[in-house]
């Protein structure tokens, strides 16, 4: 399991992101920020989901190219399942489910808030205990 290659997909709000992991090591990641919301002073949910629909394919292809991998190297997909904007989540979940089904690999639903917390463990064997996590999101 340590060398398993996992593709991570994140579309919970207004950033489209993908990352490749080999075991606990992040190989490469890309985050596309949606500038379409700037003039509105906040995120417009409908625009966010449309932008995810436009950006997700290129972001996933880009992360694979940067890592010099193809979809055939991916052994599982982790995707944000919530909480977040319903339309944005639907785009990411649908894309990930389609890939997982087409590649016949496992799909893992990830809680967005728990993902923030567990990101502290990326690249770490352990964290010194006890530790406290304050999470402010949104």
Regions found by a protein language model. Give the residues of each.
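Short acidic/glycine-rich loops and adjacent helix/strand connectors
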Residues: 1-137
